[in-house]
Amino acid sequence: MSAPAIKTGKTRPQPRFHAKPGEVKMPPGKKILMDLSTLHEPISELFKYPLSPGEWTDYALSSEQLQNFEENGFLPGIRILGPAQLEQLKAELDKVLDPEHPDNSLFYEFHLNEAEEEGRVLFHALGAWQLEPALHDLPWSPALQMAAYQLLGGAVRLFHDQLFVKPPEHGGVVAWHQDYSYWTWTEPMAHLSCWIPLDDASVENGCLQYIPGSHRWGLLPITGLTGDMNAASAALDDRQRKALETPFAAEVPAGVGVFHHPLTLHGSTENLSTRPRRAIVINLVRDGVRSNADILEDKETHNFPILPQGTTLSGQYYPLLFHPDSELGERRTEIPLAEDNAAPSPDQV
């Protein structure tokens, strides 16, 4: 979700400091310590990495899990992080929440409070993988990479990450939306997201919720990311509005990820609990996805690394995370892949 503004008449909030792709513009008096987007391999000991194709297969999803994803448009219950990894990421999250972080200007977007409701707070930022070692290495999680390969059906690249923080008792909502409605500046639609809570997630503290089967509804218009939780209902038919009444709540322990399709309708309610609800989203694309930047407004006025029309997403800001030929070799034939007919293709929606 979230990205540069598309020519729809709506605008997206812009970061406080603007730069063209490949350029860093710093606020006065600040210096960049290190732009980690230049490093396309793990730089910490956050994960133990497989050393052979056999070790990679230990992370493989089952055929039943793939079928569940195809039917519902999401797949919960994939362990990404353990206790020590969670603590390291929470410590780094606390650091980058500070607007005075020396590398703050590297964020693609940085919103201390994107909530529209009075008295609510929703921290939201994109591009944290460039700032701190563990945040940088999270997309290289072996469990995440293997699942992404199976669900996307090919080599995997990082699209962008997101941070969401809902503070206790007054955390704001994220309204029902589809991610790809914000991403039509890339094509074809071969995208995937993994939502990873850093705290135990429940309905009470605003866990992510999904509408099963909504990835088959086609592309819906943008109706807003915050504010009215049910704003998207205006774009739905009666059957679809009825489905909003019975969402699936992804109540998962900290560190357990939920993967979802780019057309799956999802959102999260307020955090009314006494606990924080912190989460990281890793958004991915299959290798070969291209820029469709001509549909964007004001391409030069934000920090998001937009590539020229028709250019394949690659280079500094879109690192290759996993390639089956190099990691699996001949054993790739043993790994089941998701069927590619669970949702309409971009030219059908």
Per-range role (PLM):
Residues 1-8:
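N-terminal acidic, proline/glycine-rich, low-complexity intrinsically disordered segments
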Residues 12-72, 78-176, 182-185, 223, ...:
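Non-heme Fe(II)-dependent double-stranded beta-helix
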Residues 133, 146-147, 181-184, 196-199, ...:
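Short helix-to-loop capping/linker segments positioned immediately adjacent to catalytic or ligand/cofactor-binding
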Residues 58, 74-76, 193-197, 247-249, ...:
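Conserved hydrophobic/aromatic beta-strand scaffold that supports enzyme active sites
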Residues 178-179, 228-244, 274-276, 294-302:
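Short, surface-exposed loop/helix-turn segments at secondary-structure junctions
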Residues 3, 13, 17, 23-55, ...:
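Non-heme Fe(II)/2-oxoglutarate
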Residues 184-203, 251-252, 283-286:
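Short, conserved beta-strand element in jelly-roll/cupin
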Residues 49, 201-265, 289:
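Double-stranded beta-helix
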